[in-house]
Curated annotation (Swiss-Prot):
GO terms for cellular component: cytoplasm; small ribosomal subunit. GO terms for biological process: translation. The keyword Ribonucleoprotein applies. It comes from the Bacteria. The lineage of its organism: Bacteria, Bacillati, Actinomycetota, Actinomycetes, Micrococcales. This is Small ribosomal subunit protein bS16. GO terms for molecular function: structural constituent of ribosome. Keywords: Ribonucleoprotein, Ribosomal protein. It comes from Leifsonia xyli subsp. xyli (strain CTCB07). The keyword Heme does not apply. SUPFAM superfamilies: Ribosomal protein S16. Belongs to the bacterial ribosomal protein bS16 family. InterPro entries: Ribosomal_bS16, Ribosomal_bS16_CS, Ribosomal_bS16_dom_sf.
Length: 153
């Protein structure tokens, strides 16, 4: 079986990202794979390249052939040099720096109003409901008194 290490395309139109996979050379580009050994995101700045070096070395050792694109990625990560016996093979992949934490500008006013006004309104509604209950209880008491007076008469 002819085995190749190649890219499997994922993502939307004009926003591709790839998985580095080991697959039979006769399968479709995005078809069934034997193993996924890494990923490649070309649209990020800098491009994100991650390869499981142990698995890449294994598959290269058993005779799988990388495609041209994957060969370039393996050279960048240093895996191809390691496979060829270069003891000084080093990864030249640039690592993206950490993003800075977001800090709100205190000079600008917030777009949304604070929720402090809403609890006061809620308390007013609760007080109105309690007052309505007291009135209902008082009216019920008046009706009961009238009914009792009507029975006595």
């Amino acid at each position: 079986m002819a085995v190749k290490i190649r890219l499997k395309r994922l993502g939307k139109i004009r926003a591709p990202h790839y998985r580095i996979v080991v697959a039979d050379s006769r399968t479709k580009r995005d078809g069934r794979v034997i193993e996924e050994i890494g990923l490649y995101h070309p649209t990020e700045e800098p491009s994100r390249i991650e390869v499981d070096s142990d698995r890449a070395q294994y598959w290269l050792g058993v005779g799988s052939q990388p495609t041209e694109q994957v060969l370039v990625l393996l050279k960048l990560t240093g895996d191809w040099g390691t496979f060829k016996g270069d003891k000084n093979a080093v990864s030249t992949v640039k690592v993206a720096g950490a993003k800075e934490a977001f800090v709100a500008d205190e000079k600008k006013k917030p777009v949304l109003k604070p929720k402090a006004a809403k609890p006061a309104e809620a308390e007013a509604v609760i007080e109105a409901e309690e007052a309505a209950e007291v009135e209902v209880v008082a009216e019920a008491g008046d009706i009961a008194d009238e009914a009792a007076d009507g029975e006595k008469a």
